[in-house]
């Protein structure tokens, strides 16, 4: 794997000279192998090691190289046609393979080749971009978007219209991560490499980027780029220093553990915020 990484790194440095017609066959094969391994979940752009998320930048480079290497081609979408560089993940699936992988894909859901979809997932009409990792037991609801290289944990619910930001450039930026057992409410947007830690509940219409203040009303602490584990978060505002105006913030109204989540429904957690 180290040799493959080094070859991808070298090709990326020479990317300005790479086109579909000039690319060396070995580089094309290396990039295609990485895309295939991402597609199967054998590799992932980010993984948690000893409690910390680590980003494998060389895999992001391979994904970016794929846009230099592969030319546009007609893609058959049953009811229509597409013209793009990236094929669709399920283009060659048959009934046996869908059953073997235990995934349910509702018509018009779109998943690009190079993204991983775990067992027992449900994809409503939604969009999953390449490099993304969607772990088992997750629901991607209608019109939700999982951006490039985003990492979605086990048993996550992405509600209708949710946007999970992608990140290929700038290259050093970390992917947006939703950890296990999280609920993201309808029309919320989590972007710019924000990490929503395990067991958190995000209410409807909450927008969180790296510059968003995430205010814990119990402690007064302000977080940036990270929603602590077990947080229940709603949209709100914080006053300016001069007291003349307020600015948007995400407010942690309470903390819950797995035991509480098991006893109390998501709607009840969000309803009682006082």
From Swiss-Prot:
Substrate binds at residues 104, 141. GO terms for molecular function: 2,3,4,5-tetrahydropyridine-2,6-dicarboxylate N-succinyltransferase activity; nucleotidyltransferase activity. Keywords: Acyltransferase, Amino-acid biosynthesis, Cytoplasm, Diaminopimelate biosynthesis, Lysine biosynthesis, Repeat, Transferase. It catalyses: (S)-2,3,4,5-tetrahydrodipicolinate + succinyl-CoA + H2O = (S)-2-succinylamino-6-oxoheptanedioate + CoA. It is found in: Cytoplasm. The keyword Repeat applies. GO terms for cellular component: cytoplasm. It comes from the Bacteria. Signal peptide: none annotated. Pfam families: Hexapep_2 (PF14602), THDPS_N_2 (PF14805). Its main location: cytoplasm. GO terms for biological process: diaminopimelate biosynthetic process; lysine biosynthetic process via diaminopimelate. Pathway: Amino-acid biosynthesis; L-lysine biosynthesis via DAP pathway; LL-2,6-diaminopimelate from (S)-tetrahydrodipicolinate (succinylase route): step 1/3. Its EC number is 2.3.1.117. Coiled coil: none annotated. Belongs to the transferase hexapeptide repeat family. NCBIfam families: dapD, PRK11830.1. Homotrimer. HAMAP family: DapD. This is 2,3,4,5-tetrahydropyridine-2,6-dicarboxylate N-succinyltransferase. It comes from Shewanella sp. (strain ANA-3). The gene is dapD.
